[in-house]
Amino acid sequence: YVNHLFATAKNIAELNMGATTVAAGFLHDSIEDTSVTPEQIEKEFGEEVLFLVEGVTKLGKIRYQGTARYNESLRKLFVAMSQDIRVLIIKLCDRLHNMQTLDAVPREKQLRIAKETLEIYAPIAYRLGIKKLQRDLEDLAFSYVHPKEYAEIKKILKNKKEVIENHLNDFQKNLKKNLLKNGITKFKIDYRVKSLYSLYKKIQKYKGDVESIYDISAIRVTVPEIGDCYRVLGIVHGEWRPLPERIKDYIASPKLNGYRSIHTTIFTGDGAIIEVQIRTEEMHKEAEHGIYA
C-alpha cells in the first residue's frame, strides 16, 4: 500500500508538478483506505491538499464496462478536470502505477484494467498534452490487451534498431555541423523512437506497409526562441530535400491538445528518410509533461 503511494507521488513529481500536487498524490487513497480523516489532512497539509485528495476520492473507481458506458466514464473525468486539472493528473499517475504492477493480478482483471487504460485514461493524457504519460499508459496496456501484436511490434523495432540508429547518428553529426556553420550555437539535438502502441496504430493505418512509415524515429532539435525554430527549418531545407506534403507547422497552428512544434521529413542523401522536429525548450517541456507542469 505504501509503495503504491510513493510510486504515485513519484510519477507526479516526474511531471514537474508542484509540491502540493505531489503531497496530494501521496495521500490520494487515505480517506478511502485508512482511518485518516479529512480534518486531519487539512490540519497537517492544508486546505488545498485536502481539496485535491477529496477530488480524487469523489472521482472514485472508473470501471471499464464496454463502449456503452464509455461516455459516462469520460464525463466523470471531465467534471473532475473542470474542478481542478490536478485531480485528473493525480488519477492518471495512480493508474500508471497500477499498470506498472498489473502482472500481480489475475488475467481477467488484467484485461479489464488494461482496456480501461487504453480506451479511457490514455486518451485523456493525450487531450491534456502529457505525451510521456500517454506513451507509458498505452505501451503498458498494449502488452496485455494485444499480447501477440505487442510481441510483433517489438520484433519489428528490434530488427530495425541498428539501421535506424546508424542513420540517425550520421544525420545528427551533419545537422550539428550545418547549424553551427549557419550561426545557430544554442541548440540541443536528440532523437525519439516511436512508442510501440503508436507504431502499431500507424502500421494498421498503412495496412501493414512498414516501409511507408517515415516517422518510426525522429530527430528533435530544441532551441531557445520561436524565431530560431524557423531559422533551423530554413537551414535543414537548404541542405536536404524535404518531402513537401510532410511539412507541418504546429507552432502556427497547434494541435487541439496544445502541442506545438515544426515537423519536416527530408531525404538524407544516403538512402534514408528522416523526420525532423523543431521546437523551443518550453514547447518540449509542454509536449512531454503537459501545459500544466
Please place each PLM-identified region on the residue numbering.
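Conserved catalytic core of nucleotide polymerization and phosphodiester-bond processing enzymes
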Residues: 17
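Nucleic-acid processing machinery
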Residues: 1-14, 23, 61-65, 70-77, ...
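Active-site alpha-helix of zinc metalloproteases
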Residues: 20, 24, 28
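Hydrophobic or amphipathic alpha-helical targeting/insertion segments
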Residues: 28-55, 130
